Amino acid sequence: MLGDRTEILGMCAAALNEHIPIAHLHGGELTEGAVDDCIRHAVTKMSYLHFPATEVYRRRIIQMGEAPERVYNVGALGVENILSVPMLSEEEIRKDVEIPAGMPYAVVTFHPVTMQPGETEQQVRELIVAMREEKQYFYLVTKANADAGGRQVNAWLAEAQRELTNMKLVSSLGMKRYLSAVKYAAFVLGNSSSGIIEAPALGTPTVNIGDRQKGRLMAETVIGCMPEAGAIQAAIRQTEQMPHRPSFLYGDGKTSQKIVKILKEFFHTDYRHWKKTFYDMECK
């Protein structure tokens, strides 16, 4: 199971009741501004094998009572995708998604802030104001996810697109086009995890808005700001002074190889005999 989406809870519950062991990727992370946090931790407790993306997250899973011999720091699949997926050239991606030639651009993704009920609309409005004011950039905006409030976010962004000539809203770019777009972008803007994991590995600065990703390990190229137009604009200007230098906080790009090796070792035994016990850390 990957990550923290609501829909995986049902699959995990079914597997648990059928005594089918679960392997969980990207556990141990914190996103205090989203309900994903609770889902992720719940899946961790239902899982037998754990494949976190950093050493900090590995230790956190152990802190939750999972035995160290079942927890492996393997890095993030997002970094592996960057190192293995053949990218489009800048000219190709600009032509493909109709970004004006010669104009610097940003890739924007803004998801609902599910732990701050009633605040999503105002945060989207502030983002739109910032894009309107920082008109030296073209904004390639991908639609919000399926979280509660996602449709409203997309409606507000569609409304903004009718007004802003320097913005294009797309449903989805797919992995190859998305990573290619981020690679050549001046910066990434919004509150998506891709600004925390993939963008730094590509060397692209990120303006991370609000608390949705609060708690994640962040590279020096990630600039956090309040969800206010003035703060967003100041952070955008700050990216202009930052070098585009890759940062690999989330592994070396060999995640899948490591996972396959570990799974092969575990499946030498009959999984029906696997037992989970609570790993009790020494209390002081």
Language-model regions: role of each:
Residues 240-284:
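C-terminal amphipathic helix plus adjacent low-complexity
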Residues 88-184:
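Donor-nucleotide binding loops and adjacent catalytic segments primarily
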Residues 1-67:
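Active-site and donor-binding regions of nucleotide-sugar-utilizing enzymes
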Residues 4, 54-55, 75, 174, ...:
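Helix N-cap/beta->alpha junction signal
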Residues 52, 72-74, 169-171, 223-228:
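Short acidic-hydrophobic, aromatic-tinged amphipathic segments that line or gate anion-handling sites
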Residues 1-2, 9-12, 25, 50, ...:
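A donor-sugar binding/catalytic signature common to diverse glycosyltransferases
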Residues 46-122, 274:
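A nucleotide-sugar donor-handling region in carbohydrate enzymes
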